[in-house]
Amino acid sequence: GLLDSIKGMAISAGKGALQNLLKVASCKLDKTC
């Protein structure tokens, strides 16, 4: 239903944000940016 799709969108948005944070963090640690 509607709640499920909203939940799914929130989860995938959260995953995307986490992946971006991890990319930035590893980039800073490895100094590869």
Curated annotation (Swiss-Prot):
<keyword id="KW-0964">Secreted</keyword>
<keyword id="KW-0929">Antimicrobial</keyword>
<dbReference type="Pfam" id="PF08023">
    <property type="entry name" value="Antimicrobial_2"/>
</dbReference>
<keyword id="KW-0044">Antibiotic</keyword>
<comment type="similarity">
    <text>Belongs to the frog skin active peptide (FSAP) family. Brevinin subfamily.</text>
</comment>
<dbReference type="GO" id="GO:0050832">
    <property type="term" value="P:defense response to fungus"/>
</dbReference>
<dbReference type="GO" id="GO:0042742">
    <property type="term" value="P:defense response to bacterium"/>
</dbReference>
<keyword id="KW-0878">Amphibian defense peptide</keyword>
<dbReference type="InterPro" id="IPR012521">
    <property type="entry name" value="Antimicrobial_frog_2"/>
</dbReference>
<keyword id="KW-1015">Disulfide bond</keyword>
<dbReference type="GO" id="GO:0005576">
    <property type="term" value="C:extracellular region"/>
</dbReference>
<comment type="function">
    <text>Shows antibacterial activity against both Gram-positive and Gram-negative bacteria and against the fungus C.albicans. Has no hemolytic activity.</text>
</comment>
<dbReference type="GO" id="GO:0031640">
    <property type="term" value="P:killing of cells of another organism"/>
</dbReference>
<keyword id="KW-0295">Fungicide</keyword>
<protein>
    <recommendedName>
        <fullName>Nigrocin-1</fullName>
    </recommendedName>
</protein>
<feature type="disulfide bond">
    <location>
        <begin position="27"/>
        <end position="33"/>
    </location>
</feature>
